[in-house]
Amino acid sequence: MDVLHILQTNFVSIIIGFVVIILLWMNRGKQSNSRLPPGPAPIPLLGNLLRMDVKAPYKLYMELSKKYGSVFTVWLGSKPVVVISGYQAIKDAFVTQGEEFSGRANYPVIMTVSKGYGVLVSSGKRSKDLRRFSLMTLKTFGMGRRSIEERVQEEAKMLVKAFGEYRDSVVNPKELLCNCVGNVICSIVFGHRFENDDPMFQLIQKAVDAYFNVLSSPIGAMYNMFPRIVWCFPGNHHEMFAIVNKAKVYIQEQAEIRLKTLNISEPQDFIEAFLVKMLEEKDDPNTEFNNGNMVMTAWSLFAAGTETTSSTLRQSFLMMIKYPHIQESVQKEIDEVIGSRVPTVDDRVKMPYTDAVIHEVQRYMDLSPTSVPHKVMRDTEFYNYHIPEGTMVLPLLSSVLVDPKLFKNPDEFDPENFLDENGVFKKNDGFFAFGVGKRACPGEALARVELFLFFTSVLQRFTFTGTKPPEEINIEPACSSFGRLPRSYDCYIKLRTEK
């Protein structure tokens, strides 16, 4: 009887405790959350997670936008997340009220790597100072040094050579494209390219690959929601953190080597430029130019600049396999404008069709449907709702890239979406492939140069064909918790007839 009484008492205590937890959760921040935008009712502790596909959360957001409109709230566990959908609302938030929405939310996978340092995850003064420096450094690389264009042209030449070794045979282009894009970043960060079999180059490439594998995986999604719990379990996230740390150590070692022979009047690479800035501001107690920010800003160039650009190129060539007539039209324009010489950035304005194809690949691919999460920097009024300071905010870029009011054929791959009736390239205000506002991709200019020069240099020499008929090729990007990435594919690379 005593045992039964004890069990009954414990059971009742558990039930009461559970009810108390639910009531506390339901009333947590009730006053501050009372004017949040509407959204689906959350389940205690889990929020709206049971309704969400962790590999494609943007699909739920697109569905909810039809019901709740351009501003709504979802709950990731116990945290409210405000989603902003549609061109006008996104512009109003991230451009018109850009300062309020300019913060970077805590994204645990990235935060564990960065410890809060670097341009990608920081907010406020740190973000502004590092972003301004990065943009200016990349922009001025052509002054007294090899220009960005020359660096990309060199890698394009190496890529053509590498593809030539596989002509008339089956190849998966992923590694070749990752290597050439990775070496562009190496040339900027370290001042020189690496051979593909160099151990340090392979370390960096493996670190970037591991980083995005975790970001794109279910365990990465769970880590971002429950970091302390997931940290306690085995998984590839531990291996990823270890190899990324090795890459960070290598960057630090390279900085220490350069510091010994640094010419402050003529820095030769990104690291040296950062070191010069550190020396200039060494007596400023509020400076953001320190070792931690140097290493993480350099790492961010690899993390943000390698996978995104190489993935877009992979998707581009997959589209050429799927649509041979589009590939032929691009090659015709290449022959007419460039001929057999080396492609240059100046050629782009004379090649509206090719430019439209590249833009359409980015629009259709929709690489990052919600961008990297933002947060509001202070209590913010938006569309008659109250968003408390620190709340995570997601711009639903997908809602703009498939808006029929902005694009003629939003559900199809159609370069005409970026051409007028005369075949002239037409800019589109809804082209948010690089994000929008104060946190738009700082490497956009570099990415545009890479996409154009790599794409034209390769199609100038080669034609891509599939291992199966075009109608059987799936061009829909594979969804992951990070974004929409191209599917793995094999193809034939055939040498074109000399013109």
UniProtKB/Swiss-Prot annotation:
Gene3D superfamilies: Cytochrome P450. GO terms for biological process: lauric acid metabolic process; lipid hydroxylation; xenobiotic metabolic process. Keywords: Endoplasmic reticulum, Heme, Iron, Membrane, Metal-binding, Microsome, Monooxygenase, Oxidoreductase. It comes from the Eukaryota. Heme binds at residue 441. The keyword S-adenosyl-L-methionine does not apply. InterPro entries: Cyt_P450, Cyt_P450_CS, Cyt_P450_E_grp-I, Cyt_P450_sf, Cytochrome_P450_fam2. It holds the Pfam family p450. It is found in: Endoplasmic reticulum membrane; Microsome membrane. Its main location: endoplasmic reticulum. GO terms for cellular component: endoplasmic reticulum membrane; membrane. It is a peripheral membrane protein. The keyword Heme applies. Its EC number is 1.14.14.1. One of its GO terms (molecular function) is iron ion binding. In kidney and in liver from juvenile and sexually mature trout from both sexes. It catalyses: an organic molecule + reduced [NADPH--hemoprotein reductase] + O2 = an alcohol + oxidized [NADPH--hemoprotein reductase] + H2O + H(+). SUPFAM superfamilies: Cytochrome P450. Its cofactor is heme. Has (omega-6)-hydroxylation activity toward lauric acid. Belongs to the cytochrome P450 family. This is Cytochrome P450 2M1. It comes from Oncorhynchus mykiss (Rainbow trout). The gene is cyp2m1.
